[in-house]
Amino acid sequence: MNTAGNNWEEFDYFPDGREQKALRKDFTFNDFQDALEFVNKVGELAEKAGHHPDINLSWGLVRVWLTTHSKHKITDKDHNLAKAIDQL
């Protein structure tokens, strides 16, 4: 596990059964509603970027995974979306 800047961590990730690298970051919130609103904002950024993260939503916690599935690795698209998410 390596830090990839801005508290994003690099992990091995198996979203479709194949190993690849991904950036991951957890975001904490006061309640489910705040977490859901954040997920919706991330979704808007993802649509604009044409690059879609994997997102886990639970009470007060959002976990975001960024990887470029077609390349099976972390690319500039992931780093750029991570920076945009950090600005929310």
What is each stretch, according to the model?
Residues 2-36, 40-61, 65-88:
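Long, contiguous binding/interaction regions
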